[in-house]
Amino acid sequence: MTEKNEKTHKTIEQAEQEGKYIRKVRSFVKREGRLTNNQERAINDHWQTMGLNHSDGVIDAPTLFANENPVVLEIGFGMGKSLVEMAKAAPELNFIGIEVHKPGVGACISSAVEESVSNLKVCEHDAIEILADCIPDDTLTTVQLFFPDPWHKKKHHKRRIVSAEFVETIRQKLKVGGVFHMATDWENYAECMLEDMQSAPGYNNLSESNDYVPRPDSRPLTKFENRGQNLGHGVWDLQFAKKA
């Protein structure tokens, strides 16, 4: 082991002994595409009212949204079209969206402003760190994870965001009865998600067949998903509720 590697190993070991969570493998690769003028303008003009920063610390949702409405958290909202559609359709809920890619954040804010959506806040940051540092336990009504990167090569499976540790983190953040809703169009990932969830303590599978659920009306059918279904591709939805 080189001196540099030895120092890194000691740093990680020391942090773990102190009870700190060290993330060793990320579930995403940050490909920073160029912002369009519209996306950049949306961020500059509306971040003050719609944006959340990791550095802001723990989120107090009633203060943030100025109401006591239930909170839905979406991890990895892409360009935000579906998230904005859901927020507009459910003004009785508050939505927080997390996305690591800035163009998607800009597009989401732009769409929300265009649709006059006021019950949505967005954050450009790693969801694992937001969950650890900013989301209080027992506060979320729903956590949504739709079409995460499947990392389909077996050697990359360790990068998949869904793991035993991750689903336990989600359980801690959900209220009793709160739902963790996942969807994927990659069958192997769906099977792995199901295995992780069925092995995790503290959850009830909402599927009548104890596996997958039909796509609920609350999750919009995306153009990509619709095209895939027309070609015979499958999509798997999973919903698990936190036990008392």
Curated annotation (Swiss-Prot):
It is an enzyme of class 2 (transferase). SUPFAM superfamilies: S-adenosyl-L-methionine-dependent methyltransferases. It catalyses: guanosine(46) in tRNA + S-adenosyl-L-methionine = N(7)-methylguanosine(46) in tRNA + S-adenosyl-L-homocysteine. Its EC number is 2.1.1.33. Keywords: Methyltransferase, S-adenosyl-L-methionine, Transferase, tRNA processing. InterPro entries: SAM-dependent_MTases_sf, tRNA_(Gua-N-7)_MeTrfase_Trmb, tRNA_methyltr_TrmB_bact. Pfam families: Methyltransf_4. S-adenosyl-L-methionine binds at residues 74, 99, 126, 149. Pathway: tRNA modification; N(7)-methylguanine-tRNA biosynthesis. GO terms for cellular component: tRNA methyltransferase complex. The active site is at 149. Gene3D superfamilies: Vaccinia Virus protein VP39 (3.40.50.150). GO terms for molecular function: tRNA (guanine(46)-N7)-methyltransferase activity. It comes from the Bacteria. Catalyzes the formation of N(7)-methylguanine at position 46 (m7G46) in tRNA. Belongs to the class I-like SAM-binding methyltransferase superfamily. TrmB family. PANTHER family: 3-DEOXY-D-MANNO-OCTULOSONIC-ACID TRANSFERASE/TRNA GUANINE-N 7 - -METHYLTRANSFERASE, PENTACOTRIPEPTIDE-REPEAT REGION OF PRORP DOMAIN-CONTAINING PROTEIN. This is tRNA (guanine-N(7)-)-methyltransferase. It comes from Colwellia psychrerythraea (strain 34H / ATCC BAA-681) (Vibrio psychroerythus).
